[in-house]
């Protein structure tokens, strides 16, 4: 099999690429190396085996068309994208060009030149908006959604908020419509929070990794307070990279069953954490005290998002295996090693 990964030097892309190399898959990695850690991930991948690296920009139609026509991949994990809510607000045009324009470039190249190529697209829970139409309770450490105690499924109303939600939502819908109208083999994963090794987190993207960085700093004697947005009771279900690898490659083996569908993806309610609960895990594991100052709530932030994954579980018999506690410890250990 010939596999293309756009954004293949990012966190998720590099994890998927490393597994592909371990399986002897013919791999093409496409990336513009603009994100923090991307060059480091490329060097790491290069130490694992041989693959084709293409330095290009998903916004450039010619780059994408040449990519598809030259390599004619059997399958593609489309991960290239602008991934930060805050960046989308600072620069909505760039956010649109990458997430919508870039996705259309890929879809059109596949439609015109390689229509049998399978595409699995990494979308987001932000397509559901701020979810303020639901009722919430507040405990000492977290918010809980009264109306959706087991999480949100795919029947949840689409409600794009923020430029990021709009751009990812538009790409999400183009993926589904190209399956419906043009018969392409596309699949959409609406992700909650992902974390794991090779995640060079930043303040506005990759919250588990970011706060693991803070824990490492505190453990090393850097005790200045850090900031969080809101009161720390916001909840997400977290999914470790090992489970992401299992998901994507299991899905790839079952594309005929799931093409043209969107799936909510996450660690489920049993692997859900608030910021405060994450801090407690890190404090206990590292024997530290995590002190922070509060900033205002971020625009369009969800108080709770937990994925109900019954649809994908029923379709391909996949579910998470790495617990939040074990995964956070793995994340901390990797962060402290770099």
UniProtKB/Swiss-Prot annotation:
GO molecular function, one term: CDP-abequose epimerase activity
Cofactor(s) named in the record: NAD(+)
Binding site for substrate: 124
CDD domains membership: CDP_TE_SDR_e
Active site: 164 (proton acceptor)
Enzyme class: isomerase
Cofactor remark from the record: Binds 1 NAD(+) per subunit.
Keyword presence, Acyltransferase: no
Descriptive protein name: CDP-paratose 2-epimerase
Organism per entry: Salmonella typhi
Encoding gene per record: rfbE
